[in-house]
Amino acid sequence: MAHIFLSQLKTVLNNCIDELEQIHFLFSRNPETDFTRKRKLTFKEYIQFMLLMQGKTVSNEILDFFSHFLSAPSKSAFTQQRYKLLPEGWDFLFHSFVTQCRSLSDDLYCGYRLLACDGSDVNIARNPSDERTFIHEGEKGYNAVHINALYDIMNKTYCDFHVQGKKKLHERAALNLMVDRYSDPAPSILMADCGYESFNTFAHLIRKNMKFVIRMKDIDSNGILSSYDLPDDE
């Protein structure tokens, strides 16, 4: 059964890539010219290549993707194709894929969609001039982004995400943004760690008619509970 599901998942992804290719001009830097000429690296191949990239150099990744054929596109050809597609194109592909995956798996827990929100740092190429991502730590410092993600627990899929520079990250603002654009009609219960506690976040969730369970900081900390006279026992 697993291989059947994976095959169906691959079909859905390819359909989403085809859909993006049909409207690529909406997400191109130069809509009238980008992705219009026949290239060694087609639009669909470029998308598939990006999704399959691992931790190797671009040159080695290209050779692996094209089975080491002599006709494989050059590194500069890849760079040119990558520049043409705006980030919004990847955002469209992600949300289109998530939506269409619901046709394969749409499990609820007692009638509720269980959502979990958390964040994680990802190191990127060092660039001291990038004020959003450069962290002055150690001898040379480093660059990192913070990925905030909304996860559907029952269906094991990501519903949404928001990327911030680590130096200026704001997890509560990221959650508020994802909650505001959440459009699933199914009743939802959201769970999050104590980094997301705030009255503003509660207001966004209540306005969206979402139930939530958010871990709070201890009453002896500087969190919300510290302003209440609560007993220090069960």
Regions found by a protein language model. Name each.
Residues 1-234:
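Conserved, well-structured functional cores that handle cations and Mg-NTP chemistry
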